[in-house]
Amino acid sequence: GLLIFGMFVVMLYTATGRASWAIAGVGLAVAGAFIASKTLTYVGWRFANWLDAFNPEIIERSGGSYQLVQGIFGLAQGGLIGTGLGQGRPWLTPLSQSDYILPSLGEELGLIGVFAILCLYMVFVSRGIRIGLAGQDDFGKLLATGLAFTIALQVFIMVGGVTRVIPLTGLTTPFLAAGGSSLIANWLIVAILLRLSDGVRSSPRVVIG
């Protein structure tokens, strides 16, 4: 839900160029999250895991913050340059192959390796936005920009979740985590962006409407 809503707000801003839509979208997301945390039990637990992750009672309870804390310890263990490929202990963090793939990589590659991965994502997103800005029509512009920000939002939500910047959700890290449907969807995004980039090289821009 958060990913779809975020993509909708980004595409609305891209189509209109009005920052007020983006600000309103952020406000609605914050308000919706607050209301959900008070009315939905599982959302309230996720907020508790986020805000008080190191509380022993929350760590030990079912569905608690154990994996979040273990992921943070894994990132801390990696330090600046990491322990080396294959030298980490990903089995100490539950779901290290999917939701917590980034802490596992951070332990082995360190802060430098994590920054390198994030830079690759930034390059991918920036290229997608450039494809949209150079698009031959407004539909291509919205499609390319929306797809690029879909990847950006996934990365932000996952990186923010495992580092306690925001509450953790059930998304996977694009192209890294073991998630069948998610992985296929992200590679379809790559294919569509490549097709759009091929179409913007020779065609003049056409404005619809």
Predicted feature descriptions by range:
Residues 1-5, 114-118, 183:
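Structural signature of hydrophobic alpha-helical transmembrane segments
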Residues 2-12, 27-31, 122, 190-191:
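Hydrophobic transmembrane alpha-helices of multi-pass, membrane-embedded glycosylation machinery
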Residues 9-19, 36-37, 122-132, 193-200:
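Structural signal for the C-terminal ends of transmembrane alpha-helices
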Residues 19-116, 136-140:
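Hydrophobic, glycine- and aromatic-enriched re-entrant/interface helices and adjoining loop segments
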Residues 30, 92-93, 104-107, 147-151, ...:
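Transmembrane helix-bundle signature of multi-pass membrane transporters/permeases
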Residues 33-37, 120, 147-157, 191:
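Alpha-helical transmembrane segments of multi-pass membrane proteins
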Residues 131-170, 176:
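Loop-to-helix entry and N-terminal half of a specific, functionally important transmembrane alpha helix
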Residues 157-209:
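A juxtamembrane structural motif centered on a specific transmembrane helix
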